[in-house]
């Protein structure tokens, strides 16, 4: 049988351990060498965290904490917090739209009893009653009126230890803080023409973008950090915010140190990162109402942009990590929408963007230190995707958004179709944004994140502006390349090849002839006949087999055999300790792992489903251990694999180990197994469905899970190539005799071939479904 290939791989995979050990010893021996550190090593100094040194500022980066600035009167931009840092009690800030809102904030020192004080607000002397009963905290209070000649009312007090306050114009409102630190929260006042509100500050202040509101709240509650990473050291006039320094350019190459052979160069670059997401949408076979997968894929993008009057050619690769798997099941009918898995990126996910351009900075990016980067944030919003059903209104997925925030940078290598590029990998953390996403015309709504269905929303690319700085050790002669291989490989060319090969394999399912497949499944395929279709020399055949076995021994199938071996040892020892007691648990647990679950067989259907599903996961190994004359799922799996290997034009010795291992794990995921007891058949599938029925009438009988567990231990396990539903359908439409039914139950290959040659639509459809399940 074709499944012999899997048995050979399981049997022989241990033999590669010796060659691995010899290789490891040799590698350790040859790599134990002494290296002369040279003049650029820092081995004589204590451990230290290297920083970027002087990184020239540019207008592309929006600082988190911009300031401090001197007191002034101006119209703050919408969507920016003004963080006020007063040093004395009195009026802190005032603002008005000259229509229906006059608002000011007053600071009151601790331990002030109720009293009237005179404040100058909008140039007018005002008598206001104030108090602060706190012994330690300062009190900010908002005073507001809605007419120019009206009286002031007090709102939203803030008791503050750090003595900081903030105000922002956004969304038709004026936002402030209230409560008590360290638990202060934001509030707001409605105002018409809010964007025209002019504000006058009477203390030093900072400017913080709304995207960093969490940072602003942290400052309000806990105070500014002791060492502030701000633009200015002392307060400057606000007009200095728009003055561009011409002392140094943002894009320059600086010689840090130099000897006769080597030099250290600092590269400062402004960059524009453009990227896009790619996705894979796979429909299941059948009537057209089922989708098996909607997932993210790495995406390459090449573009040009201008930097200091010079055209730059850049290349990016965007990939995601930490995806969240969602699913949707509209019902049990064949015409109900089903999405087995669709990926969503959320706040626990990361986006990686590998960036390369044709500037001098990337030419010798091998020995690098002091790598630092600053990048702006960007919001990625999803679009529509229609689930095109054959009949009825189409559901569609819409919405979803995340914002990307810079979280680090490291070296990487990008692999294109022609060349590998030393590049920078920018890591972005995610935050969910409005709007939420939903599957319209279903009950799925109000979910947050960015689904993989349409992550680009019709855009050609997303864009992020930023800059980076690094110091690179390069040859003093600019005509020389750094004599070493690629720096840090984080995305292998093999992954790209495997992705293309998986797509080709899945497409080849339509080209397999069923009659030939049955004949091929009956052949005793071994490793050499399986791999003979690959275009390689005979000398490489042994190496290919060794590499396949090396990969196969780490597969889930090999791990299951190892776990089963331990279980059998435990079962044998328990029997020897208590040989007089033969319980279901002691005899079955090695194969079924349900010794603790069969305490209440008739409790509920869900309990039986759980138990049969647990048993079914190990029936594949049981079937391998007790080979019968019938055909099994692994025979079909191996035959499909062999056919696709022979037809493939992209298969290579490098990709074969991964493909064979994946095929053993992923081909035909939905399997059903049966045991026969006289005229009764017990059938259970890996997804928890179970049937018990009589052979002569196909009439269902109660399913006895304990009897099924006993039969699994003592009787041969048979792959349900033609499952119960197909058998019942065949009997209802065509009628089959008892002997013919037994042959189909035993998966007799001769009978299966006869039905296929007779072009029986029910049997052909079942075999087609199994072939379509052979996907990677």
Curated annotation (Swiss-Prot):
Pfam families reported for this sequence: Rota_VP4_MID, VP4_haemagglut, VP4_helical
Which SUPFAM superfamilies does the entry mention?
A: Concanavalin A-like lectins/glucanases, VP4 membrane interaction domain
Gene Ontology CC terms: host cell endoplasmic reticulum-Golgi intermediate compartment; host cell plasma membrane; host cell rough endoplasmic reticulum; host cytoskeleton; membrane; viral outer capsid
Region (Hydrophobic) residue ranges read 389-409
- Coiled coil, from the record: 484-511
Q: Where is this region: Spike head?
A: 65-224
Q: Where is this region: Spike body and stalk (antigen domain)?
A: 248-479
Sequence motif YGL motif, location on chain: 448-450
Residues annotated as site: Binding to sialic acid: 101, 190
State the UniProt keywords alphabetically: Capsid protein, Coiled coil, Disulfide bond, Hemagglutinin, Host cell membrane, Host cytoplasm, Host cytoskeleton, Host endoplasmic reticulum, Host membrane, Host-virus interaction, Membrane, Outer capsid protein, Viral attachment to host cell, Viral penetration into host cytoplasm, Viral penetration via permeabilization of host membrane, Virion, Virus entry into host cell
Cystine pairs: 203-216, 318-380
Where in the chain is the site Cleavage? 231-232, 241-242, 247-248
Q: Where is this motif: DGE motif?
A: 308-310
Which residue ranges does the record annotate as region Spike foot? 510-776
**GO terms, biological process:** permeabilization of host organelle membrane involved in viral entry into host cell; virion attachment to host cell
Sequence motif KID motif, residues:
644-646
Additional free-text comment from the UniProt record = In group A rotaviruses, VP4 defines the P serotype. Some rotavirus strains are neuraminidase-sensitive and require sialic acid to attach to the cell surface. Some rotavirus strains are integrin-dependent. Some rotavirus strains depend on ganglioside for their entry into the host cell. Hsp70 also seems to be involved in the entry of some strains.
Tell me which HAMAP family the record gives: Rota_A_VP4, Rota_VP4
Q: Which family does it belong to?
A: Belongs to the rotavirus VP4 family.
Q: What is this protein called in UniProt? A: Outer capsid protein VP4
Provenance organism: Rotavirus A (isolate RVA/Dog/United States/Cu-1/1982/G3P5A[3])
Q: What is the lineage of its organism?
A: Viruses, Riboviria, Orthornavirae, Duplornaviricota, Resentoviricetes
């Amino acid at each position: 049988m074709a499944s012999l290939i899997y048995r050979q791989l399981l049997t022989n995979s241990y033999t590669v351990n010796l060659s691995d050990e010899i290789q490891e010893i040799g590698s350790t021996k040859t790599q134990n060498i002494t290296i002369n550190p040279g003049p650029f090593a820092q081995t004589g100094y204590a451990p230290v965290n290297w920083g970027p040194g002087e990184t020239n500022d540019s207008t592309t980066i929006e600082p988190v904490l911009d300031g401090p600035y001197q007191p002034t009167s101006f119209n703050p931009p919408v969507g920016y917090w003004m963080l006020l840092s007063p040093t004395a009690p009195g009026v802190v800030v005032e603002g008005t739209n000259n229509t229906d809102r006059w608002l000011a904030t007053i600071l009151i020192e601790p331990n002030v009893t109720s009293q009237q004080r005179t404040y100058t607000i909008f140039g007018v002397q005002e008598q206001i009653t104030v108090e602060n009963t706190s012994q330690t905290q300062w009190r900010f209070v908002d005073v507001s009126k809605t007419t120019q000649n009206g009286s002031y009312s007090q709102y939203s007090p803030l008791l503050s230890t750090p003595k900081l306050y903030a105000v922002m114009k956004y969304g038709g409102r004026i936002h402030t803080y209230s409560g008590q630190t360290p638990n202060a929260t934001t509030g707001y006042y409605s105002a018409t023409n809010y964007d025209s509100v002019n504000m006058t500050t009477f203390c030093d202040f900072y400017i913080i973008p709304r995207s960093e509101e969490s940072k602003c709240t942290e400052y309000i509650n806990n105070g500014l950090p002791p060492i502030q990473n701000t633009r200015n050291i002392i307060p400057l006039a606000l007009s200095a915010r728009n003055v561009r320094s011409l002392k140094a350019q943002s894009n320059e190459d600086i010689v840090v140190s130099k000897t006769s052979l080597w030099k250290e160069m600092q590269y400062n670059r402004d960059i524009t990162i453009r990227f896009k997401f790619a996705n894979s949408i796979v429909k299941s076979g059948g009537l057209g109402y089922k989708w098996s997968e909607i997932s993210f894929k790495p995406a390459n993008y090449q573009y040009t942009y201008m930097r200091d009057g010079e055209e730059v050619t850049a290349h990016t690769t965007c990939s995601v990590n930490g995806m969240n798997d969602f699913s949707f099941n509209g019902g049990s009918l064949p015409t109900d929408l089903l999405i087995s898995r669709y990926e969503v990126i959320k706040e626990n996910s990361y986006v990686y963007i590998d960036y390369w351009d044709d500037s001098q900075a990337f030419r010798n990016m091998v020995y690098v230190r002091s790598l630092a980067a600053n990048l702006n944030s960007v919001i990625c919003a999803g679009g529509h995707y229609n689930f095109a059903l054959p009949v009825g209104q189409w559901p569609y997925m819409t919405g979803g958004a995340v914002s990307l925030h810079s979280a680090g940078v490291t070296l990487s290598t990008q692999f294109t179709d022609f060349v590998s590029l030393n590049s920078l990998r920018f890591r972005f953390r995610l935050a969910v944004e409005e709007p939420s996403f939903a599957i319209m015309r279903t009950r799925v709504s109000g979910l947050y994140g960015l689904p993989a269905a349409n992550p680009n929303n019709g855009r050609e690319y997303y864009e992020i502006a930023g800059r980076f700085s690094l110091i690179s050790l390069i040859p003093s002669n600019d005509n020389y390349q750094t004599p070493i291989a690629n720096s840090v490989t984080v995305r292998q060319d093999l992954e790209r090849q495997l992705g293309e090969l998986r797509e080709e394999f899945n497409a080849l399912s339509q080209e397999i002839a069923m009659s030939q497949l049955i004949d091929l499944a009956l052949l005793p395929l071994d490793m050499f006949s399986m791999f003979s279709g690959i275009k390689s020399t005979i000398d490489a055949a042994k190496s290919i087999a060794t590499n396949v076995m090396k990969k196969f021994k780490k597969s889930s199938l090999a791990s299951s055999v190892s776990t089963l071996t331990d279980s059998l040892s435990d079962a044998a020892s328990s029997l020897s300790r208590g040989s007089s007691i033969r319980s279901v648990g002691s005899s079955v647990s090695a194969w079924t792992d349900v010794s603790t679950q069969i305490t209440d067989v008739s409790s509920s259907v869900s309990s039986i489903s759980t138990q049969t599903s647990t048993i079914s996961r190990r029936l594949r190994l049981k079937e391998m251990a007790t080979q019968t004359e019938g055909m099994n799922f692994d025979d079909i799996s191996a035959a499909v694999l062999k056919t696709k290997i022979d037809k493939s034009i992209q298969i290579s010795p490098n990709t074969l180990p991964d493909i064979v291992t994946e095929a053993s794990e992923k081909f035909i995921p939905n399997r059903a197994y049966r045991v026969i007891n006289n005229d009764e058949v017990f059938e259970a599938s890996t997804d928890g469905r179970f049937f018990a029925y009589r052979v002569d009438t196909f009439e269902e009988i109660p399913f006895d899970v304990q009897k099924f567990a006993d039969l699994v231990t003592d009787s041969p396990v048979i792959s349900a190539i033609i499952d119960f539903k197909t058998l019942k359908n065949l009997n209802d439409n065509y009628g089959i005799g008892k002997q013919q039914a037994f042959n189909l139950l035993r998966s007799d290959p001769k009978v299966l071939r006869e039905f296929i040659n007779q072009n029986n639509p029910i049997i052909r459809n079942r075999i087609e479904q199994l072939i379509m399940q052979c996907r990677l």
